[in-house]
Amino acid sequence: MTTLAIDIGGTKLAAALIGADGQIRDRRELPTPASQTPQALRDALAALVAPLQAHAQQVAIASTGIIRDGSLLALNPHNLGGLLHFPLVKTLEQLSNLPTIAINDAQAAAWAEYQALEGDITDMVFITVSTGVGGGVVSGGKLLTGPSGLAGHIGHTLADPHGPVCGCGRTGCVEAIASGRGIAAAAQGELMGADARTIFTRAGQGDEQAQQLIHRSAHVLARLIADIKATTDCQCVVVGGSVGLAEGYLALVKTYLAQEPAAFHVDLLAAHYRHDAGLLGAALLAQGEKL
């Protein structure tokens, strides 16, 4: 059975056909609409899936935000241009005339990355550092979603009680500091207004402020990972996302994690499926892998 997998992120929308063999075909991308109107997202999704839907038997959506009863509920609306709510499953069933499931994107990615691990691993955590910071938890070989879909939203745990206000309404969240949006928001002087990609480029060129911003992000993430180890006793943490996979970033996180007491150390791995983990995880779940 072929699955039309869709990944809805804060920066881009992606779609692909994924067969039972896990192979990705006909991958396509569009920018995520920076609009508070549901119609803008619906129109973008319609354009994305139209060339693919005739070749699939089902649809699987991996989306940022809390997924509850088939709908997207934005924990941080800024990540989707201010959009608060969107009926994912209903919309895609109308657009494609195919049975549809939806799951949080980091939860989906966690499931795909768990399947790729070697050895006797039953407990792992996936962290994506991108526009926002999200996560997925596998415990005892089972993906945790929680009764309301909130499980794994580790980007909204506390990093600094005196830090910036997060889009979720809390103060000092990990996401508000460590994410691509958080890195960019903290930039000053000649870097003010630059996006995270530009800041990473400038850091590679020796810009001191850019390097400090990236170190700050990596340090916050390392402390989060130590907290996760204390909470879950996971055997490994897999890091993905555009920031998480940026050159040199994971090495920085490892350096800061090594400064924590040994009890909180855990193996850190780069995402095996890189930017396709959400698509693959959603397809796996739609094709019969159990939560």
Curated annotation (Swiss-Prot):
- Source organism superkingdom: Bacteria
- Which residues does the record give as Zn(2+) binding sites? 156, 166, 168, 173
Q: Which CDD domains match?
A: ASKHA_NBD_ROK_EcNanK-like (cd24069)
One of its GO biological process terms is: N-acetylneuraminate catabolic process
Which Pfam families does the record cross-reference, listed alphabetically?
A: ROK
Q: What class of enzyme is it?
A: transferase
Q: Which family does it belong to?
A: Belongs to the ROK (NagC/XylR) family. NanK subfamily.
Q: Which PANTHER family match?
A: N-ACETYLMANNOSAMINE KINASE, ROK (REPRESSOR, ORF, KINASE) FAMILY
State the protein's name. Answer: N-acetylmannosamine kinase
